[in-house]
């Protein structure tokens, strides 16, 4: 198939949508498809309509001189209407505010082009205005296939529609490595320590605190400061814990102040995937304090390494974690603090979650999940 992937942001910008679109393009190319990424994100000083190769994927940049190099091009609409019909299918990737994606949607509606739209963001409280700016019901009636990266995100999109629409789930996927190697190593250690029942179970105690990890941007929406506060509450309840935070961002100074006041955190900074996988191999638990996370790539990577996950109700993490089997779902920060304290003092419960996470590989990988995308593309073409 000739496939166009349309996204406002793309490399060299760094973020969730950028990473997913790039990895999707590479996976489709490896499967033998002709892939073009069309983006409004500039690379270097060049502006206008130009192309470059990213491996076997063609990247077409329709860029304009916009302050702060924002991925916005008010002049791209005519080009998209002219050229998108050349593709067998168009896959448009959208956040909450994605003007370039909207131009592509309008082009596909006007030219009756087979297209899928995927929302990578949880609309949260934006639904009240989103419905006035985006005629979702008209898009669906024109033949567009509407999807989101999780059930939680999909329900929010449906809620934002002026009329009834059906939004499917097209989940994010990750590469197998380095996460699978980390899982195998952790599973071997788990068995040798008696985690499979061959020896007395591991117990956290004074010699080894419960090792908790999280990886995120240190920004208010990611709620790392509340994580520091709730883990401090867990420690006050007798939990022997140590939380390693991977990432960087504007909340760093606030976190450093909380650490000086006794919060059981260490800031590890931003590291690459290999370093993160190595850290996960020796950890016990991943915690995600984000409220209404659209998906949770960092949590998926941790789960791929065999870590159970504690997460908030309403999060897209529910797509790949089963409450009580390989993680715990909580409704508040107080419940999260209680769950952390419980796992630190009840090693058998932690062992149960850990064993399930280690012994059951995830299916949300490009090698195991790409057919979900291809099946949807074929359906859209009919």
Residue ranges and their predicted role:
Residues 152, 173:
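Carbohydrate-associated surface elements
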Residues 349-363:
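A short, well-ordered alpha-helix in the C-terminal region of glycosyltransferases
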Residues 253-271:
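Nucleotide-activated donor-binding/catalytic signature segment of Leloir-type glycosyltransferases, i.e.
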Residues 323-334, 342-347:
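Conserved acidic donor-binding segment of nucleotide-sugar-dependent glycosyltransferases
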Residues 308-311:
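Short hydrophobic beta-strand element within catalytic cores of glycosyltransferases
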């Amino acid at each position: 198939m000739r496939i166009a992937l349309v996204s406002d942001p793309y490399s060299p910008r760094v973020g969730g949508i950028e990473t997913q679109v790039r990895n999707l393009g590479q996976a489709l190319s490896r499967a033998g498809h002709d892939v073009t990424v069309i983006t409004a994100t500039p690379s270097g000083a060049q502006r206008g309509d130009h192309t470059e190769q990213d491996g076997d994927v063609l990247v077409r940049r329709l860029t304009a001189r916009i302050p702060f190099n924002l991925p916005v091009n008010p002049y791209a609409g005519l080009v998209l209407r002219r050229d998108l019909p050349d593709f067998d299918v168009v896959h448009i990737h959208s956040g909450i505010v994605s003007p370039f994606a909207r131009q592509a949607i309008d082009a596909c509606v006007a030219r009756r082009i087979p297209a899928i739209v995927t929302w990578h963001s949880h609309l949260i409280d934006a639904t009240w205005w989103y419905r006035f700016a985006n005629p979702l019901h008209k898009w669906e009636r024109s033949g567009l296939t509407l999807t989101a990266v999780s059930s939680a995100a999909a329900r929010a999109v449906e809620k934002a529609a002026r009329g009834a629409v059906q939004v499917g789930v097209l989940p994010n996927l990750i590469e197998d490595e380095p996460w699978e190697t980390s899982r195998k190593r952790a599973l071997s250690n788990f068995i040798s320590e008696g985690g499979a029942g061959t020896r007395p179970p591991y117990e956290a105690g004074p010699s080894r605190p419960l090792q908790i990890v999280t990886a995120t941007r240190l920004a208010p929406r990611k709620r790392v400061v509340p994580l520091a506060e709730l883990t401090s509450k867990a420690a006050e309840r007798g939990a022997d814990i140590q939380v390693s935070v991977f990432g960087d961002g504007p909340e760093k100074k606030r976190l450093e102040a909380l650490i000086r006041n006794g919060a059981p955190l260490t800031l590890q900074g931003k590291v690459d995937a290999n370093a993160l996988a190595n850290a996960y191999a020796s950890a016990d638990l991943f915690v995600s304090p984000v409220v209404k996370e659209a998906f949770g790539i960092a949590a998926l990577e941790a789960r791929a390494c065999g870590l159970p996950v504690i997460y908030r109700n309403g999060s897209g993490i529910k797509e790949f974690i089963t409450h009580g089997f390989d993680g715990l779902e909580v409704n508040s920060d107080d419940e999260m603090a209680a769950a952390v304290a419980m796992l630190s003092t009840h090693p058998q419960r932690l062992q149960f979650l850990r064993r399930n996470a280690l012994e059951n590989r995830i299916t949300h990988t490009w090698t195991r999940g790409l057919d979900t995308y291809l099946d949807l593309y074929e359906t859209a073409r009919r």
